[in-house]
Regions:
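A short, Lys/Arg-rich alpha-helix, primarily the initiator
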Residues: 1-27
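Recognition helix of helix-turn-helix/homeodomain-like DNA-binding domains
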Residues: 31-51, 72-73
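Short, basic-rich loop-to-helix N-cap that marks the start of a DNA-contacting helix
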Residues: 46-61, 77
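N-terminal small-domain helix-loop-helix segment of the aminotransferase-like
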Residues: 95-188, 195, 362, 374-377, ...
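Conserved core of the PLP fold type I
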Residues: 146-280, 297-310, 478-479
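PLP-dependent enzyme catalytic core of the Aspartate aminotransferase-like
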Residues: 172, 429-431, 439-448, 454-489
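Conserved core segment of the aminotransferase class I/II
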Residues: 310-389, 399-401, 484
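Conserved glycine-rich beta-strand-loop-beta hairpin in the small C-terminal domain of fold type I
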Residues: 372, 388-402, 410-424
Length: 489
């Protein structure tokens, strides 16, 4: 029968349906960063007081009930004997999709920050790019100047001027057989990775992806219904791909191979002879090549970046790049992909790309408008990656500082702004690298990404972003050394 209940009655009923006790609500509040104590919950349950709006919202979210129902909605009668509310689960397509670069460790860091704790972040490239490095003035000026003309949609593949500039950049990289219709702009490379995987993979199709990888590749391949098969990059060989491992993992279901060059998270740069070996394997097994080259302008030590597409005019290649890293405009969301080589063998796939490109209408038009200026003007990033430049000097410092810590070793990166140190797991008795990252965060307030977040199979690595100034990196390395002096898992 219908009966009017107090707030306390409704709260207790909702707790019973969720099989939650007062202590469970307290733990949930701690996790969510909501300031509510044991005495508060006790008073709500006993009916001595009712919560303020913020706490009411937290309770309704935690208990999966409507906030208006929980508050009584002005005293309206509520029937507690009706069937439980319908709940909505995530799609089963996401069951095997992981993106731990922004996962539990980051959630814990966010909770700590909400509670007033300062976190030393040597993880977030996007935040650090914005806070530490300036976007070139001419890029900002151009966006402001053209903003009034960027209010409508562009062609789905992008503005002509932007694609023309990208095509000319592809020519400088010696990428063969590229015209204006082979260029697609996107809201960052991330959108285009998702689009390219969705257009290619059917259930059961396999795609070779490096380990360690940037996890979006694995996530997008899995979400598209494919199977990511990880080939090993060998730490003992400058993190270059292990060719024998690639050969072992190719089979009749393999459709493509992915390269990340320069590499995130290792900072490796693949020389021409390594790329040629991959081309030879792709040619033998008739594979498509996807090459993520977003860091191609962040190469140090006088090394040259070679685009693998320039070595494979007879294969179908898709090359990805953008302005987020080289021009410090991650928030502008502008990337591109370039189709090259033998496009005749991929006509149907290209039709799928066009369909998906049309479905999202177009990418960010104001950001497209600055591509021509960004690619054609002074490349200010060059000043950062030479001796005396900030990125160069910060790499030198963090590499030496990490290698000086007992139990830590690292391969010196040649490009990008990442280093992927190895931990002596026997020395520190580490069996769970995510727990290591959480313990470091809670003890020393340092945020890193654990190696398994990059689909690395062993719990013995972590990634550091060396974009902060040397004094910040020094503080972080001292705290890490202190932590490892006593840490045992």
């Amino acid at each position: 029968m219908n009966q009017t209940f107090t707030f306390a009655d409704r709260l207790k009923s909702a707790m019973e349906q969720k099989h939650m006790k007062q202590v469970d609500l307290i733990h949930a509040a701690e996790t969510a960063g909501v300031k509510v104590g044991k005495s508060h919950i006790s008073q709500y349950v006993s009916g001595k007081t009712v919560p303020r709006a913020e706490i009411l919202h937290f309770l309704s979210e935690t208990l999966d009930v409507d906030a208006d129902w929980l508050s009584g909605n002005g005293g309206n009668a509520v029937n507690l004997e009706t069937s439980p509310r319908r709940t909505f689960s995530k799609s089963t397509k996401l069951d095997n999709v992981l993106y731990d670069v922004r996962g539990p460790v980051v959630d814990e860091a966010n909770r700590m920050e909400r509670n007033g704790t300062h976190i030393l972040k040597i993880k977030y490239r996007e935040i650090l790019l914005h806070l530490v490095y300036r976007t070139p003035d001419e890029v900002i000026y151009d966006m402001r100047h053209q903003l009034a003309d960027c209010q409508g949609y562009s062609a789905s593949q992008g503005l002509f001027a932007a694609r023309k500039a990208i095509m000319q950049y592809a020519q400088l990289k010696k990428i063969p057989n590229v015209d204006i219709d082979d260029i697609y702009t996107g809201n960052g490379v991330s959108e285009l990775i998702n689009l390219s995987m969705s257009a290619l993979l059917d259930d059961g199709d396999e795609i070779l992806i490096p380990s360690p990888d940037y996890p979006l590749w694995t996530a997008c391949a899995t979400l598209a219904g494919g199977k990511a098969v990880h080939y090993i990059c060998d730490e003992q060989s400058e993190w270059y791909p292990d060719m024998e491992d690639i050969k072992r993992k190719v089979n009749s279901r393999t459709k493509a191979i992915v390269l990340i060059n320069p590499n995130n998270p290792t900072g490796a740069l693949y020389p021409r002879e390594v790329l040629q070996q991959i081309v030879d394997i792709a040619r033998e097994h008739q594979l498509m090549i996807f090459s993520d080259e977003i860091y191609d302008r962040l190469v140090m030590d006088g090394e040259e970046h070679v685009s693998i597409a320039s070595l494979a005019p007879d294969l179908f290649c898709v090359t990805f790049s953008g302005l987020s890293k080289s021009h410090m405009i991650a928030g502008f969301r502008i990337g591109w992909m370039i189709l090259s080589g033998n496009k005749a063998i991929a006509r149907d796939y290209i039709e799928g790309l066009n369909m998906l490109s049309n479905m999202r209408l177009c990418s960010n038009v104001p950001a497209q408008a600055v591509v021509q200026t960004a690619l054609g003007g002074h490349q200010s990033v060059n000043d950062y990656i030479i001796p005396g430049g900030r990125i160069y000097e910060q790499r030198e410092f963090i590499y030496n500082a990490l290698c000086d810590i007992p139990g830590i070793s690292a391969v010196k990166p040649k490009a990008a702004f990442y280093i992927f140190p190895k931990i002596d797991t026997k020395k520190f008795n580490i069996t769970n690298d995510e727990q290591f990252a959480l313990d470091l965060l809670r003890e020393k307030k340092i945020l890193i990404v654990h190696g398994s977040g990059f689909n690395w199979k062993d719990p013995d690595h972590f990634r550091v972003v060396y974009l902060p100034r040397v004094e910040v990196l020094k503080d972080a390395s001292v705290k890490l050394r202190d932590f490892l002096e006593y840490y045992r898992q």
